[in-house]
């Protein structure tokens, strides 16, 4: 259901802003209300949006249920998954405003990726994930072979890593 926008007058001293509210039509969806799982998914998506929004252009405030998101940039988003930098070591790189990634050791020794292309979550990965991971694993294989004189496969390295990627 789309309602008529509510436009209110504010004092001239108030900075201009746009506030977008989401109110699901429970009847249309055939549900009585939002479950805890649904709320969790919506909250995750709000954090996703906060992570991929370019906060340098404008001071954007993103919130959920009247509470501002703690995520102010992509690095904050990575912290939600693996803890802060002092708890979990990671490598972070931002080559330009279009590519940004972080690598950390996977806690469960299974490759995991969290990636976005143009602000859209690509939970199944894709060519962008392969592109970055192939470069990382190839360089690590070369480094380990040169420094430690041990031959390892890219797959054995990949399964130990967690990749966060925004492009």
Predicted segment positions?
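GHKL-type ATPase core
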Residues: 1-72, 76
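GHKL/Bergerat-fold ATPase module in large chromosome/replication-associated machines
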Residues: 59-159, 163-167
